[in-house]
UniProtKB/Swiss-Prot annotation:
Keywords: Amino-acid biosynthesis, ATP-binding, Cytoplasm, Kinase, Nucleotide-binding, Proline biosynthesis, Transferase. ATP binds at K17, T178, D179. It comes from Methanococcoides burtonii (strain DSM 6242 / NBRC 107633 / OCM 468 / ACE-M). This is Glutamate 5-kinase. It is found in: Cytoplasm. Transmembrane segments: none annotated. PANTHER family: GLUTAMATE 5-KINASE. InterPro entries: AceGlu_kinase-like_sf, Asp/Glu/Uridylate_kinase, G5K_ProB, Glu/AcGlu_kinase, Glu_5kinase, Glu_5kinase/COase_Synthase, Glutamate_5-kinase_CS, PUA.
Length: 375
C-alpha cells in the first residue's frame, strides 16, 4: 500500500481545483457553506506556511441561474454571457469567505494561450509568485467570455487549466475536487460493481479508457479531462489527487495521508521548466519526420530538413509545433522555418536551403535546445 503521508504530507505549494458541481447546489445556487469550509481549511494551511492557489469553476453555472436560462445553453455567446454575469458573483462570495479568516484574495482569469507565449507565461508566473509572497490567495478561473475552443469543449471545466497552473508554478500537489469519490474502472453511476482505484502509478491506455464523457448540465462529470490533467502533472513532478468534495475536512485529511480519492503518482524524470513549457503549450501545426530523424532527436540532436517528410497546418517561425513519426506525436519543438518554407526544403540537405529559398536562416529546422520529447 502506498504511504500517502510520506508522499504528499510535506507538500508546500498546493493547487486546489473546485469543480462546478462542488460549488453549486442542486438548484443551481452557490453552496456558501462549502466555500466557507474550503476557506477555513486553506487558512489553516496558510498559517502552517504552505502556499495555496485556488482554481475555481462555477461562473457559467452561476450565470445560468442568474439569467434564468433553465438549461445548458448551446450557443457559445450565451455561455460567455453567463460566465461574465457569474464571475463577479463568484469572486464576491470567495472574497467574503476568506475575509472571515483574515485572508485577501486575487482574481486571475486565464486562457490556455496564457501559457503559449513564453513572455506572457513568465509574467503570469511572476505575478502569482508575488501574490503568494504577500500572503494573498490567488483564485484562478478560465476567462470564458473570450475563450472559444475551451468553452466549446467543456462548460466551465478547469481540470486541465489547474494542471497547467500546477505545472507552471512548480506545485507539489494538485487536488481536484469533484462530485464522485475518484477514478473508477467503470462509471459508478451506472455500474454497482465499479471499483475505485486508490493509486495510479502510470497512466496506461487502460487507465485512459476509464475516462468518461461530460454528463452534468452545469459542469463536467466525466473523468477524461481529469486524466488529461494527471498527464500534465506526471511530466511536471506534481502529484495529483481526485477526491469527493462532499467529504468532511477533505484537504486536511488528504495531507494527513488518508486514502481519500485517487492518488496519481508522478514521473521521477521531470523536464526543465522551459522544455515543460514547450511540451504543454498549444501547438500551431505538425512536422512529420522519418525514423532516422526521430532517433537523432532522441540523442539530443537538432532536426535537419533532410529528416522532414511533410508538414500539417500553417505556422510561422517561432511557433510551437508537434513532432510526428509514423502517425505518432512524440514531442514538440519551436520551429525556425515557416510551414511554407518547410514544404519547399523538406527532405533537402542544409547546403541546398539557400538555393531553394534564396536565403538560409539556419542549418536546422528545430534547434536541439528547443525540443521537448514525450517520455
Amino acid at each position: 500500500m502506498t504511504n500517502r503521508k510520506e508522499i504528499i504530507g510535506d507538500a508546500e505549494k498546493i493547487v486546489i481545483k473546485i469543480g462546478t458541481t462542488s460549488i453549486s447546489r442542486e438548484d443551481g445556487s452557490l453552496n456558501n457553506e462549502f466555500m466557507d469550509t474550503i476557506a477555513s481549511q486553506v487558512s489553516e494551511l496558510h498559517r502552517a506556511g504552505k502556499q495555496i492557489i485556488l482554481v475555481s469553476s462555477g461562473s457559467i453555472g452561476i450565470g445560468i441561474e442568474i439569467l434564468d436560462l433553465g438549461c445548458r445553453p448551446k450557443e457559445i455567446p450565451v455561455r460567455q454571457a453567463a460566465a461574465a454575469v457569474g464571475q463577479g458573483v463568484l469572486m464576491q462570495h470567495w472574497t467574503e469567505a476568506f475575509q472571515k479568516y483574515g485572508l485577501n484574495v486575487a482574481q486571475i482569469l486565464l486562457t490556455y494561450d496564457s501559457f503559449t507565449n513564453r513572455l506572457t507565461y513568465l509574467n503570469l508566473r511572476n505575478s502569482i509568485s508575488t501574490l503568494l509572497s504577500y500572503g494573498v490567495i490567488p483564485i484562478i478561473n478560465e476567462n470564458d467570455p473570450i475563450c472559444v475552443h475551451e468553452i466549446e469543449a467543456t462548460l466551465g471545466d478547469n481540470d486541465k487549466l489547474s494542471a497547467m497552473v500546477a505545472s507552471k508554478m512548480e506545485a507539489d500537489l494538485l487536488i481536484l475536487f469533484t462530485d464522485i469519490d475518484g477514478l473508477y474502472d467503470k462509471n459508478p453511476k451506472r455500474h454497482d460493481d465499479a471499483v475505485l482505484l486508490r493509486t495510479v502509478e502510470e497512466i496506461t491506455p487502460t487507465i485512459e479508457s476509464y475516462g468518461g464523457n461530460p454528463t452534468s448540465m452545469k459542469g463536467v462529470g466525466g473523468m477524461r479531462t481529469k486524466i488529461d490533467a494527471a498527464k500534465i502533472c506526471n511530466i511536471s513532478g506534481c502529484y495529483m489527487v481526485i477526491a469527493n468534495s462532499n467529504v468532511d475536512d477533505g484537504i486536511r485529511r488528504i495531507l494527513d495521508g488518508e486514502e481519500l480519492g485517487t492518488l496519481f503518482l508522478t514521473n521521477q524524470f521531470v523536464h526543465k521548466n522551459r522544455i515543460r513549457w514547450i511540451i504543454l503549450a498549444r501547438s500551431s501545426g505538425s512536422i512529420v519526420v522519418d525514423t532516422g530523424a526521430k532517433e537523432a532527436l532522441a540523442k539530443r540532436m537538432s532536426l535537419l530538413p533532410s529528416g522532414v517528410l511533410g508538414v500539417a497546418g500553417t505556422f510561422d517561425r517561432g511557433d510551437i509545433v508537434k513532432l510526428e513519426c509514423d502517425g505518432v506525436v512524440f514531442g514538440k519543438g519551436i520551429t525556425d522555418y515557416t510551414s511554407e518554407e518547410l514544404k519547399a526544403i523538406k527532405g533537402k540537405q542544409t547546403n541546398e536551403i539557400a538555393d531553394i529559398l534564396g536565403y538560409k536562416n539556419y542549418d536546422h529546422v528545430v534547434q536541439k535546445d528547443n525540443i521537448g520529447l514525450f517520455k
